[in-house]
Amino acid sequence: GMVGMSIALLATVLGVVTDHHLLLVLGLIVGGAIGIILARRVQMTHMPELVAILHSLVGLAAVLVGFANFMDPEVHFEGVEQTIHNIEVYLSILIGAVTFSGSVIAFGKLSGKISGAPLALPGRHWLNLGLLIITIVVGWQFVNESANAGIGITSAGLNPLMIMTAVALLFGIHMVMAIGGADMPVVVSMLNSYSGWAAAATGFMLSNNLLIVTGALVGSSGAILSYIMCRAMNRKFLAVIAGGFGTSESASIGDNAVQGEAVAIESIEVANLLSGAKEIMIIPGYGMAVAQAQHTVCEITKVLRSKGINV
């Protein structure tokens, strides 16, 4: 992965037609230094929130590139090509803005800076529907204003584009705020998918085949992973996109939660508690990996197998 990204960055720097290579190299140095510092300081237990904040940067990049491409006076399209290009710009900024604001809220919830309790506003689904209608109407206005503007006029359609950006940011905030903190892993996976689609839309806008392919791969794999996670947790996939995910079920689980303090026990004690079973399946997950519990699990497995239990 590191080698591939290094080759991609090198090809981008050498392939870009610009006289400001010094700024590009400076940006690479600053970004690389920040990445190295984060990789060394962030613990595995904080990895989900790091992934969330990195997704926000992908969304922000899509928004900034979209505005820069739309306002570039050297970009000229006519007729159907102009309409298609404007739709690509619109979708890139739309998905990027939702990804950015949603990922920032997800980072805040995972890091404890924002309460993990779901924010269930009355009529939240009607609010989502209203935001969707506004996005469609403003998009139609944006395409018409841009098509009717003269060549070289970059300000035409800018106001609808800014309105849509604000609406998309609001939707991203509302979508993630309505989700309980315990369900954040599914949300992070979904935001990963959003970041991929934002990159793919940016690739169409810039006529960059590499961005289109990689963005589609990330977007589709993230969506499939989110669907599988929802099925495993007995959740509805569409509820993740609409918001309000994990409000009723999570609340009922919390009301019936067992009170008291957790007591640590040894691996031998765990094996003795499981000695009455005939077959045991141990499924490793993220928590086991973070806790580095593989050695303890191995000891439990040895004790159970010595008693004739199929593990």
PLM feature spans:
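Transmembrane alpha-helix boundary signature
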Residues: 12-25, 37-47, 63-79, 143-150
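Structured cytosolic domains appended to multi-pass membrane proteins
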Residues: 258-311
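Structural signature of hydrophobic alpha-helical transmembrane segments
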Residues: 15-32, 85-100, 154-167
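C-terminal ends of transmembrane helices
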Residues: 33-51, 103-118, 171-184, 226-230
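Mobile "lid/hinge" segments at catalytic clefts and subdomain interfaces of large enzymes
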Residues: 180, 194-238
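Transmembrane helix-loop junctions at the membrane interface of multipass transporters and ion channels
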Residues: 68-80, 143-155, 186, 193-213
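Membrane-interfacial segments at transmembrane helix termini in multi-pass membrane proteins
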Residues: 217-277
